[in-house]
């Protein structure tokens, strides 16, 4: 079952996001293995990222093996761990 993740970074900026995404996503501009969707943009209090992975296990593997170990060392990246909301995806549609 697909698995959704919403990350909110209070005080986060576009520049911090771009530095962070360059470090944790493939250099060819694609998505990490198992990720189906990624969107990001400014929110009322900072920066918000929405992702959908093909499964909870896919998300946890990316989080534990790539995202969390890499984030603290990214120069100019998002400086704090996100506020996280996760959910099993009940309905996923694309245009």
Where do the PLM segments sit?
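Short S/T/G/P-rich N-terminal loop/turn motif that feeds into the first structured element of a domain
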Residues: 1-50, 54-69, 75-95
């Amino acid at each position: 079952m697909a698995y959704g993740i919403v990350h909110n970074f209070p005080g986060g900026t576009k520049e911090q996001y771009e530095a962070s995404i360059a470090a944790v996503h493939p250099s060819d501009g694609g998505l990490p293995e198992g990720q189906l969707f990624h969107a990001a943009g400014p929110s009322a209090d900072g920066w918000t990222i929405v992702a959908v992975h093909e499964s909870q296990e896919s998300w946890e593997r990316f989080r534990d093996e790539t995202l969390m170990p890499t984030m603290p060392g990214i120069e100019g990246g998002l400086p704090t761990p996100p506020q996280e909301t996760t959910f099993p995806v009940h309905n996923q549609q694309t245009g």
